[in-house]
């Protein structure tokens, strides 16, 4: 299942609180990337907000795994997890309708 994770620094968290945890946080993120679990990472125009796209069995399992991250353990981040489902694009629907017209009736 694809899961969008939105990580936000909690209000009042300073960079000096975050810096001691960055090396371990990045090491753990890189390990998730190498296993294919972490698919994409995006920085945003909002300071302190990062978007990560994961592939995981469920939102609940990913939430549990993310509690091991140093910034989460230190209570410096809050996270929102959104399970995503893929819907057929219009072009794909049109293609099916054109090649198999009776399937959409």
Please identify what each model-predicted range represents.
Residues 1-105:
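Conserved, structured core segments of small domains
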């Amino acid at each position: 299942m694809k899961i969008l994770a939105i990580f936000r620094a909690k209000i009042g968290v300073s960079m000096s609180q975050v810096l001691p945890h960055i090396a371990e946080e990045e090491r753990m993120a890189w390990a998730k990337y190498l296993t294919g679990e972490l698919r994409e990472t995006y920085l945003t125009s909002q300071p302190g907000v990062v978007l990560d796209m994961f592939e995981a069995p469920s939102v609940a399992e990913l939430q549990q795994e993310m509690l091991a991250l140093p910034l989460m353990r230190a209570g410096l981040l809050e996270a929102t997890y959104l399970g995503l489902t893929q819907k057929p694009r219009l072009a794909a629907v049109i293609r099916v309708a054109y090649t198999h017209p009776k399937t959409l009736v």
